[in-house]
Amino acid sequence: MAQWDQITVDGSPMRLYVGMPSLGRAFPAVIVAHHGPGVDKFIEDRVEHLARQGYLAIAPDLYHRQAEEGDVLTRIGRLQDPEVIADVNAAVNYARRLKDTQLGDVGIIGFCMGGRVAYLMAASKPVFKAAGVFYGGNIMKPWGNGPTPFDLTPYIHCPIAGFFGAEDANPSLEDVDRISAQLDRYRKAHEFHRYPDAGHAFLNFTNPATYREGPARDAWDKLIPFLQRTLQTSRQPRQRLS
């Protein structure tokens, strides 16, 4: 079951698309950081799929602070890392407050700009026990005046699974290799998968120009076991994030 809900973050209403497993009361959670178009049909589908796999899945609308006008790049350009961190934290706290549920470990995945968000959060909050980065661009660029996600690599607290298309320009394979080397440098557990016949947004089935069925299926089929290995169901009480 999946539906829209709404919370308030820093005085601004933020919508969330929430997928709830149909069985049980105790389960891990996965935050789904959306791609440039926002929480659209593709992101909703990923939330629903994760819920069917037994995860409480939540996709927050990271654009909630800004007006809807502007193209994708303009809207991405308005995002600020401190605000994004606050939004993701609010989504985790929302999961922890849900009635009749017992929350286990929390992971995060993201696509395109959301892949960058997943990398950022892996370094920003130790609450996350796993991060899935799907063709995350601009990991080496800041949103605002703070450090880049790349600069924060020493503070990463969880294993990362990355999925990248060899034909992508952002991130390019050179970018991917540089990020992997940085993770190696700081001995951060990661597995990176590169697909030679895919470019950016190769999982997005709503875009025939970029979708690649084979790589998309393979990447998702690798993500689910990764989450199963890293996220556990727990009955221990959790503290609210600040």
Feature names for model-found ranges:
Residues I108-G110, F134, F163:
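Short beta-strand immediately N-terminal to the catalytic nucleophile in serine-hydrolase-like folds
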Residues G110-G114, A118:
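Gly/Ala-rich beta-loop-alpha elbow adjacent to hydrolase catalytic centers
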Residues V127-N138:
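A conserved short beta-strand
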Residues A169-D175:
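Conserved alpha/beta-hydrolase "acid-adjacent" motif
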Residues K99-F111:
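Alpha/beta-hydrolase fold nucleophile elbow
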Residues W4-T101, T148-P149, F202-N207:
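Serine-hydrolase catalytic machinery in alpha/beta-hydrolase-like enzymes
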Residues I156, G162-F164:
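Short beta-strand/loop motif that positions the catalytic acidic residue
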Residues D184-S242:
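C-terminal catalytic histidine-bearing segment of alpha/beta-hydrolase fold enzymes
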